[in-house]
Amino acid sequence: MRILGIETSCDETGVAIYDEEKGLIANQLYTQIALHADYGGVVPELASRDHIRKTAPLIQAALQQAGLEAKDIDGIAYTCGPGLVGALLVGSTIARSLAYAWNIKAIGVHHMEGHLLAPMLENNPPKFPFVALLVSGGHTQLVRVNAVGQYELLGESIDDAAGEAFDKTAKLLGLDYPGGSVLSRLAEQGNPERFFFPRPMTDRPGLDFSFSGLKTFAANTINQAIKQEGELTEQTKADIAYAFQQAVVDTLAIKCRRALKETGFKRLVIAGGVSANKQLRQSLADMMKQLKGEVFYPQPQFCTDNGAMIAYVGFLRLKQGEYSPLEIDVKPRWAMTELKAI
């Protein structure tokens, strides 16, 4: 079985082909960073229009990369939600149209289930059950994963997601777009001793997160530094970036440790765009070593949005006989706990 996967939930157009026997045989990705850079964030209308321009050429490129023709594809998976409604509609419409034309089944895939199962594409995939930390620009969640489709939400952010807090703090520091990754690189030059940021909601029980207060703390620290220095020096920016990043990483690690203790599990999966963060990976790897457990994460190219994870999840569900009706439908808001177990 060969599945074509299409990802258009936000500002990346991803197309991939997953083969049941060979694994991932094609992966194409176009990022819209340059398109949105002047605006300092994703403009939904521009994102949708760019998906319209890029999706079909990427499908052709993926088929060519795999050495396949349309007749060789057995099913199509597309991101149905959550995400930007216009962007989702582009991928959904193209996927449904191709499925109808090629007389094959199509299935709408949950974007975050794609991220959660992305580590399954690696040579050493995690075994069930495990705790998953899904951390991106739109989500920060801790999930108990018993099997594919058997998900229990343990905790989530009650306001800003971790990735969103990274981007907003980077903007306050005057860093280039996309700010989160720029802030992380800058933090490597920071002085660990100069600033200390709070670890929000770690002084109380529970597994929920809150990062909006951390962003406010960063803004106040920046304003104070400007009063003292006149304008922020590059070193001060790096010092603030370090303190902010360390606060986020420590907070995520503390909550992960609690979730592992609560479930009794020894396996931790980290996925989503922020899972590419080097400091987060190192911190959680050190923690799991102390706990005599295992940590898993996708390779960097599969941390951000991509078609490979959608193709893989689509394969799992289509193989079990699950498919979506012909009507074009998207779910901008969609809880992962609503998914069927397979």
Swiss-Prot record:
Cofactor(s) of this protein: Fe(2+)
Binding site for Fe cation: H111, H115, D305
Free-text cofactor note: Binds 1 Fe(2+) ion per subunit.
Any one Gene Ontology BP term: tRNA threonylcarbamoyladenosine modification
A GO CC term assigned to this protein in UniProt: cytoplasm
EC number: 2.3.1.234
Annotated binding of substrate, by residue: L134, V135, S136, G137, G138, D167, G180, N277
Signal peptide as annotated in the record: none
Pfam families linked: TsaD
InterPro entries, A to Z: ATPase_NBD, Gcp-like_dom, KAE1/TsaD, TsaD
Keywords: Acyltransferase, Cytoplasm, Iron, Metal-binding, Transferase, tRNA processing
Compartment(s): Cytoplasm
Catalytic activity line of the entry: L-threonylcarbamoyladenylate + adenosine(37) in tRNA = N(6)-L-threonylcarbamoyladenosine(37) in tRNA + AMP + H(+)
Source domain of life: Bacteria
CDD domains in the record: ASKHA_NBD_TsaD_bac
Molecular function GO labels: iron ion binding; N(6)-L-threonylcarbamoyladenine synthase activity
Family as reported in the entry's similarity comment: Belongs to the KAE1 / TsaD family.
Function: Required for the formation of a threonylcarbamoyl group on adenosine at position 37 (t(6)A37) in tRNAs that read codons beginning with adenine. Is involved in the transfer of the threonylcarbamoyl moiety of threonylcarbamoyl-AMP (TC-AMP) to the N6 group of A37, together with TsaE and TsaB. TsaD likely plays a direct catalytic role in this reaction.
The protein's name in its UniProt record: tRNA N6-adenosine threonylcarbamoyltransferase
Organism: Histophilus somni (strain 2336) (Haemophilus somnus)
Phylogenetic lineage: Bacteria, Pseudomonadati, Pseudomonadota, Gammaproteobacteria, Pasteurellales
Primary gene name: tsaD
